[in-house]
């Protein structure tokens, strides 16, 4: 009986260890993907901000021209 209990305990430990490892890997992959997406969004926000400033500057320059 003791050998059966030890075997079951060892099997359960291996199962939990595997599940924790998979969970940790999935979490790390998700965090890495989020970091990449946040960086890309930040870059795009900067480009959009620059484009908006450029358009506003052109619009303001056009308004300043007096005929």
From Swiss-Prot:
Its main location: secreted. It is found in: Secreted; Fimbrium. It comes from the Bacteria. The keyword tRNA-binding does not apply. Residues 1-67 are annotated as: Disordered. The keyword Secreted applies. Keywords: Fimbrium, Secreted, Virulence. Residues 20-43 have a biased composition (Polar residues). Belongs to the HrpA type 2 family. Major structure protein of the hrp pilus, which is a component of the type III secretion system (T3SS, Hrp secretion system) required for effector protein delivery, parasitism, and pathogenicity. The hrp pilus functions as a conduit for protein delivery into the host cell. This is Hrp pili protein HrpA. It comes from Erwinia pyrifoliae.
């Amino acid at each position: 009986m003791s050998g059966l209990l030890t075997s079951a305990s060892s099997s359960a430990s291996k199962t939990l260890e595997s599940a924790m490892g998979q969970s940790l890997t999935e979490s790390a992959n998700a965090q890495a993907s989020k970091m990449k997406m946040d960086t890309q969004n930040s870059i795009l926000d900067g480009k959009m901000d620059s484009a908006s400033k450029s358009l506003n500057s052109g619009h303001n320059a056009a308004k300043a021209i007096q005929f």
